């Protein structure tokens, strides 16, 4: 199966500047294509997983993935579909986040010097050296403000009478220049992104056409939500991160294990590497035994992101907790100072400190709603003092928030 054919078959396709021509070119030759990521966190989360799988698919078909880390544009912030001005990051934060993002991506694609090896570039390399007057002189005449004002991402903010700074308004010019720079210096002929990036992508393709006459393409993916309308990558407990220092492989496994029934076949198609035959069998399994299908999906996706050993460990932990009622040391663990436990800590504070509630008020609400357990016993008093008497074997206390979220507190 060819790249574009598989791209469409897996459900990645939304829009393309010239699909027929791009299909023909990718059949005849290998191309370089890029996707950009802002440096807004020390890890990517599953909201970026489709884009990551596309980079992986490109590489598997012999094309060259280019990853752009927006060290330059992150200093401004993308206004696309954002209701508010984004916080501007320091150079130190951007560098730290870029390192974490490369760690996320390295789980899925190979970086190196080979023909199809991925490369990672920071657009600060070329944007930081910009002279503003030179940029206006050399590129300003190619951009139409009339057209920029009609783009949905800008129009939305204006219609709501929300602040859109000149700083953010320049973002689309810089992203267009990124595409031009990559086309000129890396022979990049395709930019990929979410459907919310369509306007920015088209502006870049137009800039290249006007300046150099090169044939380049833009292609977008649909914006994904769960079947209930929730945004991919976010849960009540926070983001579903790809890096294990922010989210344990067990919690990653549990996210997919607990996804909505209506989503599992679609997620298998988007995020797994099942062959068509395996996918057909998976669809049959999902119709006959939804829980078995969810376990298989969670296992496969955890293996892909972390390792087969991590997937096995997560599965074994889940079996011990949910099917055998045991405590497993592979559960996510937080460390509490022994002095704190000796002095005693209220139940609601402990749930907050352990990360099972984002605030103390949320922890109180969890307990009042009968959703909190300590050592598998319901917590009825939010002010109950938890001390060393609650320690189980191996000096741990098991905390549970609802039926699915568990954590060990270790001293």
Swiss-Prot record:
Organism: Rickettsia massiliae (strain Mtu5)
Domain S4 RNA-binding stretches: 345-411
Compartment annotation: Cytoplasm
Entry protein name: Tyrosine--tRNA ligase
Underlying gene: tyrS
Residue interval(s) of motif 'KMSKS' region: 231-235
UniProt xrefs under SUPFAM superfamilies: Alpha-L RNA-binding motif, Nucleotidylyl transferase
Task performed by this protein: Catalyzes the attachment of tyrosine to tRNA(Tyr) in a two-step reaction: tyrosine is first activated by ATP to form Tyr-AMP and then transferred to the acceptor end of tRNA(Tyr).
Membership in a protein family: Belongs to the class-I aminoacyl-tRNA synthetase family. TyrS type 1 subfamily.
GO cellular component, one term: cytosol
GO molecular function: ATP binding; RNA binding; tyrosine-tRNA ligase activity
Chain segments annotated as coiled-coil in the UniProt record: none
């Amino acid at each position: 199966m060819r790249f574009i054919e598989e791209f469409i078959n897996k459900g990645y396709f939304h829009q393309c500047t010239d699909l027929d021509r791009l299909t023909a070119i990718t059949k005849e030759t290998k191309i370089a294509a890029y996707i950009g990521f802002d440096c807004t966190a020390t890890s990517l989360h599953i909201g970026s997983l489709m884009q990551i799988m596309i980079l992986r698919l490109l590489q598997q078909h012999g094309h060259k993935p280019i990853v752009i880390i927006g060290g330059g544009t992150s200093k401004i912030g993308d206004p696309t579909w954002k209701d508010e001005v984004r916080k501007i990051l320091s150079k130190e934060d951007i560098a730290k986040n870029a390192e974490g993002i490369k760690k996320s991506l390295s789980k899925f694609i190979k970086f190196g010097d080979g023909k199809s090896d991925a490369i990672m570039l920071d657009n600060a390399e070329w944007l930081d050296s910009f002279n503003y007057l030179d940029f206006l002189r050399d590129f300003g005449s190619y951009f139409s403000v009339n057209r920029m004002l009609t783009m949905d991402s800008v129009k939305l903010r204006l219609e709501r009478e929300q602040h859109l700074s000149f700083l953010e308004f320049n973002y689309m010019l810089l992203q267009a220049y990124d595409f031009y720079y990559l086309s000129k210096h890396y022979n990049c002929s395709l930019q990929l992104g979410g459907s919310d990036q369509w306007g920015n992508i088209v502006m870049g393709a137009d800039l290249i056409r006007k300046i150099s006459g090169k044939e380049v393409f833009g292609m977008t993916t649909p914006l994904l939500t769960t079947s209930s309308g929730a945004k991919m990558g976010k849960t009540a407990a926070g983001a579903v991160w790809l890096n294990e220092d922010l989210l344990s492989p067990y919690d990653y496994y549990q996210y997919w294990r607990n996804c909505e029934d209506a989503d599992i076949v679609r997620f298998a198609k988007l995020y797994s590497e099942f062959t068509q035959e395996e996918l057909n069998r998976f669809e049959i399994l999902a119709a006959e035994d939804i829980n078995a299908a969810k376990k298989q999906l969670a296992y496969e996706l955890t293996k892909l992101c972390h390792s087969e050993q991590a997937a096995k460990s997560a599965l074994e932990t889940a079996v011990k907790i949910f099917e055998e009622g045991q405590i497993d040391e592979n559960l996510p663990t937080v460390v509490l100072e022994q002095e704190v436990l000796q002095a005693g800590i209220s139940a609601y504070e402990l749930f907050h400190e352990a990360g099972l509630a984002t605030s103390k008020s949320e922890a109180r609400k969890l307990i009042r709603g009968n959703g909190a357990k300590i050592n598998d016993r319901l917590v009825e008093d939010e002010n109950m003092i938890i001390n060393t008497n609650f320690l189980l074997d191996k000096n741990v206390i098991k905390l549970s928030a609802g039926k699915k979220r568990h954590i060990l507190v270790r001293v």
